[in-house]
Amino acid sequence: MQTSNITNHERNDSSWMSTVKSTTEVSWNKLSFCDILLKIITFGIYSPHETLAEKHSEKKLMDSFSPSLSQDKMDGEFAHANIDGISIRLCLNKGICSVFYLDGDKIQSTQLSSKEYNNLLSSLPPKQFNLGKVHTITAPVSGNFKTHKPAPEVIETAINCCTSIIPNDDYFHVKDTDFNSVWHDIYRDIRASDSNSTKIYFNNIEIPLKLIADLINELGINEFIDSKKELQMLSYNQVNKIINSNFPQQDLCFQTEKLLFTSLFQDPAFISALTSAFWQSLHITSSSVEHIYAQIMSENIENRLNFMPEQRVINNCGHIIKINAVVPKNDTAISASGGRAYEVSSSILPSHITCNGVGINKIETSYLVHAGTLPSSEGLRNAIPPESRQVSFAIISPDV
């Protein structure tokens, strides 16, 4: 960011272009519009650095900008605003964005870096701003592939277009060892999913997240669990206590679900299918993807101006787990032990910005859990070899 004084007078160091750190102790509602605008070009409205209150103030300020008419396009002006009696013009000339504003009785010009310009552009309100032919657009990272490699080896590709549902570094990081992190993985995901970002289905019936949280708690899965521990199956009374605490005991409407979950929660293969679905499920802590976040916001900016702000939030992810009972090929017993096998599909679906608008990155892992599979890292490792796990990555973009 370069600042010059149009009147060739010495720039006032107390101007709004003085550095405003993200950790400023000044109350947000006491910041001047200049301080807020500086934060916008530094981080962008949708940065994970910003709180909801900060985003609200920033959005309110950016809503003041209107598209410039063709006859007003001095120096490539494409947007203007009058805030607190101060006139501000945004100009794009030869691919360089500048902000013109009044500082006392002087007109100042601030030239933005490419990152600052893109942060500013992505924060403008959903109006048609004419940026001219000089504006270049870079397509987002995209690709489709299937691989038998374990999940850690595809994280580098996945991270290019996804952020995480894990809100901070308080949760466990992805490990490189096969299934040794599985208990920590499900614990951190369920703990982080208080906003219902995780959905779990059995035969297309959604299992309430609170029920799953109570289940893993009863199974002894917590932040202190030994990664090599084999889970002990719950008794009927333990399962019944969990079920009754989540469903009204006298309500006959839930009888089918109560019977179903009572049966599933006592099946070691189902517990194995459920817990393994969270294993190294391509979730990454938000702090580790901030640079990728900035890159996405920088590279994909054209049509985002046409969408409402809530559609432009990039850190909006979902973890979808589907578990289906395997239908036997004949009428004989499903297995010698009377158990059943399960097909598992685990997908993370983070929304993102593309040149075509709002899209979805689908990162999916699918595999089979055989009847009788024991819920332990060793049991999962023996029953679900790497070659049985198919990881696919794709971008799904809407038609525009």
From Swiss-Prot:
GO terms for biological process: proteolysis. Residues 224-315 are annotated as: Tubulin-binding domain. Its EC number is 3.4.22.-. It is found in: Secreted. Its main location: secreted. It is an enzyme of class 3 (hydrolase). It comes from the Bacteria. Changing H56Y: In plasmid pINV_F6_M1382. It holds the Pfam family EspG. Induction: Transcriptionally activated by VirB and MxiE, in association with IpgC, upon invasion of the eukaryotic cell. Induced at 37 degrees Celsius. The active site is at C34. Alpha-tubulin-specific protease that is required for entry into epithelial cells and for subsequent intra- and intercellular spreading. Contributes to bacterial entry into epithelial cells by inducing microtubule (MT) destabilization and the formation of membrane ruffles. The membrane ruffling evoked by VirA results from the activation of host rac1, which is associated with the destruction of MT networks. Creates a tunnel inside the host cell cytoplasm by breaking down the microtubule infrastructure. Monomer. Interacts specifically with alpha tubulin, a major component of microtubule. This is Cysteine protease-like VirA. It comes from Shigella flexneri.
